């Protein structure tokens, strides 16, 4: 909040802090960029987070921190973009504000990018999208272990008590992460 009160000076401090970007620096700069509706600064932050994955948590947290009303145009554009990274962050932002990403979720589940599929499968359960239960069950056979885990977890949340339970049990016995 102090950075917001500081206005342009606060924004400049955040930009300077990105010389050595970490989670906190990325978070502060992203909050300022979102509040200022600065698309160039957001694009720079996306590039930083993609090249330094440890800083992504700050970017995602900023999307969850700011008022949902500040995100409406930005998230809508990201959900319909070609870039899987931006779509993944948009889905994460939606779920952090308890907003259903809409039709973009079904499209993301079928995407070739495993990180986007993983986030979409997770969001399916978080949003209670029972219409996507068949897609979650189909994703139990995904090549990616994280996709399989979130498909199973979401399918259980959506009411499946057979295939998804077995998949979660196998996941745990195999010693997989999550």
What residue ranges belong to the model's regions?
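Amphipathic alpha-helical scaffolding segments comprising HEAT/armadillo-like alpha-solenoid repeats
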Residues: 6-17, 38-49, 68-80, 98-110, ...
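Short, solvent-exposed linear motifs at loop/edge-of-secondary-structure regions
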Residues: 15-39
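Structural detector for internal amphipathic alpha-helices that build alpha-solenoid repeat scaffolds
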Residues: 1-5, 27-36, 55-68, 85-99, ...
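Short inter-helical turns and helix N-cap capping residues of alpha-solenoid HEAT/ARM repeat scaffolds
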Residues: 21-24, 51-55, 82-84, 112-115, ...
